[in-house]
Amino acid sequence: MAMMEVQGGPSLGQTCVLIVIFTVLLQSLCVAVTYVYFTNELKQMQDKYSKSGIACFLKEDDSYWDPNDEESMNSPCWQVKWQLRQLVRKMILRTSEETISTVQEKQQNISPLVRERGPQRVAAHITGTRGRSNTLSSPNSKNEKALGRKINSWESSRSGHSFLSNLHLRNGELVIHEKGFYYIYSQTYFRFQEEIKENTKNDKQMVQYIYKYTSYPDPILLMKSARNSCWSKDAEYGLYSIYQGGIFELKENDRIFVSVTNEHLIDMDHEASFFGAFLVG
C-alpha cells in the first residue's frame, strides 16, 4: 500500500526540475518588466528635454528668464539659450578678428606697392642732347642699309621732359616690351647758317626717316617726311622743323629709331628735336 502511494506521486527529480523552470521564468519576467519600465522612463525623459529645447527655439515658452535666479539657471532651456548665445558671440568675435587682420595685411602689402608703381603705362618721350659729339651714327655703321644717318644719342632721364615707362633705350633705339599698336612720332630741328656767295643756289633737302628693326636683319621703313627749302641769302639763319607720326603694330623686342639727311644741320635742342611712342591698344 505504501509502495503504491510513492509510485503514484511526483518524484524528487521532477520536483527539482519544475522549481528550476519556475525560477527561470520568474527571473525572465522580472527582467522584462524592468527593461520595459526603464525604457519607457528614458523615452519620457528624452521627449521632455527634446520638447523643452525645441520650445526654447520656437519661442513656445514665454516665461521670463532671470540670469541671477538659481531656478532659472538650472532650467535646461535657459542653459541651452545661454550656451548658444556664447557660441554665437565667440564665432562673431573670431570672424571679426580674422577679417580685420586680413584687411590690414592686404593694405600693408599691396597699398605701398600700388602707390609706388602707380598706373601701368607703356610710353616713352626722349629729347635731343645738344653738345654730344656722338649724336649721329658713323657712315660705316651697321645701319648703312637705312637711309640717312641714325640719331644715336637721346636724353632719356627724367631731369627734363624725357621719360621711359615699360620701354627702354639702347643705342638710340626704343626697344618694345609689349606687343600692340603704338603711336610713333618724331620731330627734328634743322638750323642752317653759312656765308652765302653770289650766284650760289642756297637750297637744302631735309628728310626724316623712322625705321624699325624686327627679327628680319634689315631695317624696315615706317615713315618719312621731306622738304626742299631755299632760304634767303639775306637771312642770318635758316630754321625748319619736320614732324611726323603714325600708328603701327609692333611686337616684343622690335626696335624703332630715327635717321636724317643733312645731319650737320640738325640742332638737338631738347625742346625742338624729340622722339617717342606710346601704346594705344
Curated annotation (Swiss-Prot):
Could you give one GO CC term from the UniProt record?
extracellular exosome
Its post-translational modification remark reads:
Tyrosine phosphorylated by PKDCC/VLK.
SMART domains xref list: TNF
Which positions, given as ranges, span the membrane? 18-38
- Residues of the region (Disordered) are 124-144
**Keyword Transmembrane annotated:** yes
What GO molecular function annotations does the UniProt record carry, in alphabetical order? cytokine activity; identical protein binding; signaling receptor binding; TRAIL binding; tumor necrosis factor receptor binding; zinc ion binding
What residue stretches are annotated with the THD domain? Answer: 122-280
Taken from the record's topology, the Extracellular segments are 39-281
Query: What does the UniProt entry say about where the protein is found?
Result: Cell membrane; Secreted
What highest taxon heads this organism's lineage?
Eukaryota
Those parts of the protein on the Cytoplasmic side are 1-17
Protein topology in the membrane: Single-pass type II membrane protein
In Swiss-Prot or TrEMBL terms, this protein is called Tumor necrosis factor ligand superfamily member 10
- What species was this sequence derived from? Homo sapiens
